[in-house]
């Protein structure tokens, strides 16, 4: 009975172990929740137009480039203490009485320091042509007095690409001196003809510099107007041995009247880039739609047509091209990111109530196709109408993804009207999605230096356009899974692309079997610049330094681990097991000691009894 009476107290020793194992086995319940963290990130400074991301001071923390009062650029540097983004660097363009229209950080002179390209509309503009100026980086900051105003103007915001494969960003666009595309080569800042084409460039364009031919070398994608019919079309200029030549021309979907900005994503998780196109079938966007054309195909497949919710019809906000804009014009844009880390990229869009004036940001989740119209694409978008903190932001103008806490989980940034006449309010929403899915975060640097960088600072923040990343792994069910992404493929019209790629892996904790990285190559070079790494740990950040450019086997990669919830749960379970084992050892030791004492007393008693 005494032994039976001790049984409950012995079982109590199992509780840490059982609790830990229960948590580990069940895991967190997936949840789609957003939490507004604007105050802790910005304090009272949450206003302006977020125009770009980049690591200005090379501290491996992404900084924010914000436009204010039409002609000021403020750089919010990431900080370890709240508020976590502080306005530290300011460049003013007030003396030029200009409206700044875009900001593109990059290393335009090859010194491994981040510079910043601004495009602007002069106050006295008559032809609506954009001026451009480069502020040069120095000592991990910007010198407002050290700048170069480009000697040509642009018809539209330029595309930042690596035209000659030297990993110094170049500036591509139609200038005031020719109706043919020109390229301003980074480094020596010399102008050259880029391409010979009869097509006109569409305004606003959504050109891209990304691999579309599955050879790990970035191609040039152009949004153009047919020279004879003036219809919208899309041209792929393939990079063949470092030279661009037109390989594919694709017409827009026949019934699309309002054409938005092209976006690129590995929509179906096959390792190849797909082309997404939002738009409307009527001028007022009463009937909105998103089409997709798969890699290597020419057939447009609708992946979202249902924009109605509880009797309310929503639609895209058409682009308004004003001759004298007072604010930055914003075209129909999909901002791509894997919100739930399932390996299938999702999107953020701005939609307007077609029967009212309400305008909000919505999350589009990438889900398996459930109807005949999207069968060819295998997947489709589903609108998440009910995301509380996102729904509370009225008059939203821009919504994009951003890894606020550098933990591999993509959070959301929304710009909305209403702060002042000329400035937006900035809202930041933490992503509390807790399915404990895995990811790999990859950033490819310029590789212009390795261990011999100026002031021994590795240039983490040079915003390199053109690298292409692809992985292969095995999912939780044992099937082969691929994923791919291009780094900084688009730069115009508030593309707001991140200087890194977060690739979701789903709930499989398997190592990545292969991770490939390719970079652009110069004219005449036939060998592809591509390197492979194997057995990459999930939930890690990989920083690739392609140095020297033409010897991929010598490229280096730095790996940084980001522990996930499962690591914490495993630690709890392990501690529980250790406590349990120590308790058992302690009890057994105590019982053995008691038995020894009892035996000694019996021996002593027997000795005295025998003596008598």
From Swiss-Prot:
Source species, domain of life: Eukaryota
Protein's UniProt keywords contain Transmembrane: yes
Pfam families (UniProt xref): C2_ITFG1 (PF23122), FG-GAP_3 (PF13517)
Record keyword Hydrolase present: no
Membrane topology: Single-pass type I membrane protein
Keywords from the UniProt entry: Glycoprotein, Membrane, Secreted, Signal, Transmembrane, Transmembrane helix
Residues bearing glycans: 36, 95, 139, 146, 151, 176, 188, 226, 243, 353, 371, 482
UniProt GO cellular component terms: extracellular exosome; plasma membrane
Transmembrane region(s): 567-587
Signal peptide: 1-33
Gene3D superfamilies: Integrin alpha, N-terminal (2.130.10.130)
Tissue: Ubiquitously expressed.
Compartment(s) of residence: Secreted; Membrane
UniProt repeat feature FG-GAP, residue ranges: 258-293
InterPro entries per UniProt: FG-GAP, Integrin_alpha_N, Tip
Similarity comment: Belongs to the TIP family.
Assembly notes: Interacts with RUVBL1, RUVBL2 and alpha-tubulin.
General function of this protein: Modulator of T-cell function. Has a protective effect in graft versus host disease model.
Entry protein name: T-cell immunomodulatory protein
Organism: Homo sapiens (Human)
Gene, per the UniProt record: ITFG1
């Amino acid at each position: 009975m005494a032994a039976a009476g001790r049984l409950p107290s012995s079982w109590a020793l199992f509780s840490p172990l059982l609790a830990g194992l229960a948590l580990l086995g069940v895991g967190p319940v997936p949840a789609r929740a957003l939490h507004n963290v604007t105050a802790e990130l910005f304090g009272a400074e949450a206003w302006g137009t977020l125009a770009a991301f980049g690591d200005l001071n090379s501290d491996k923390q992404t900084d924010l480039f914000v436009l204010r009062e039409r002609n000021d650029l403020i750089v919010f540097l990431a900080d370890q203490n709240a508020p976590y983004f502080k306005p530290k660097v300011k460049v003013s363009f007030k003396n030029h009485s200009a409206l700044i229209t875009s900001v593109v950080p990059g290393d335009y002179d090859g010194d491994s320091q981040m510079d910043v390209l601004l495009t602007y509309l002069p106050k006295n503009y008559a032809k609506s042509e954009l001026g451009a100026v480069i502020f040069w980086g120095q000592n991990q900051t910007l010198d407002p007095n050290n700048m170069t105003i480009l000697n040509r103007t642009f018809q539209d915001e330029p595309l930042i690409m690596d035209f000659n494969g030297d990993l110094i960003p170049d500036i591509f666009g139609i200038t005031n001196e020719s109706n043919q595309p020109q390229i301003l080569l980074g480094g020596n800042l010399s102008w050259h003809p880029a391409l010979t084409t009869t097509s006109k460039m569409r305004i606003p364009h959504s050109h891209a510099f990304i691999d579309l031919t599955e050879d790990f070398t970035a191609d040039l994608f152009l949004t153009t107007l047919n020279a004879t019919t003036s219809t919208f079309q899309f041209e792929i200029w393939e990079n063949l041995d470092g030279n661009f030549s037109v390989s594919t021309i694709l017409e827009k979907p026949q019934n699309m009247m309002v054409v938005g900005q092209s976006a690129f994503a590995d929509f179906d998780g096959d390792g190849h880039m797909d082309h997404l196109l939002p738009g409307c079938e009527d001028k007022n966007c009463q009937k909105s739609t998103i089409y997709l054309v798969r890699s290597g195909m020419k057939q447009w497949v609708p992946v979202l047509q249902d924009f109605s919710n509880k009797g309310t019809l929503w639609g895209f906000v058409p682009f308004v091209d004003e001759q004298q804009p007072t604010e930055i014009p914003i075209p129909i844009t999909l901002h791509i990111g894997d919100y739930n880390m399932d390996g299938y990229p999702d999107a953020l869009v701005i939609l307007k109530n077609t029967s009212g004036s309400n305008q909000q940001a919505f999350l589009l989740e990438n889900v398996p196709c459930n109807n005949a119209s999207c069968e060819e694409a295998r997947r489709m978008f589903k609108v998440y109408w009910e995301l509380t903190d996102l729904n509370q932001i009225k008059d939203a103008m821009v919504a994009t993804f951003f890894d606020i806490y550098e933990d591999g989980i993509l959070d959301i940034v929304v710009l909305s009207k209403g702060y002042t006449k000329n400035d937006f309010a900035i809202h930041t929403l933490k992503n509390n999605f807790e399915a404990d899915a895995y990811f790999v975060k990859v950033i490819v640097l310029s590789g212009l230096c390795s261990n011999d960088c100026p002031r021994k600072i590795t240039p983490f923040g040079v915003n390199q356009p053109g690298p292409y990343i692809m992985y292969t792994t095995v999912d939780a069910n044992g099937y082969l899974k691929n994923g791919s992404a291009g780094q900084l493929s688009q730069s115009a019209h508030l593309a707001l692309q991140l200087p890194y790629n977060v690739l979701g892996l789903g709930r499989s904790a398997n190592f990545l079997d292969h991770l490939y990285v390719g970079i652009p190559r110069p004219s005449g070079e036939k060998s592809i610049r591509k390197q492979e790494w194997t057995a990459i740990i999930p939930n890690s950040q990989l920083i690739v330094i392609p140095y020297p450019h033409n010897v991929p086997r010598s490229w280096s990669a730095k790996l940084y681990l980001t522990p996930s919830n499962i690591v914490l749960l495993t630690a709890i379970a392990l501690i529980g097991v250790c406590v349990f084992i120590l308790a058992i050892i302690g009890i057994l030791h105590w019982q053995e000691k008691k038995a020894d004492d009892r035996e000694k007393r019996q021996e002593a008693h027997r000795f005295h009894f025998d003596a008598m």
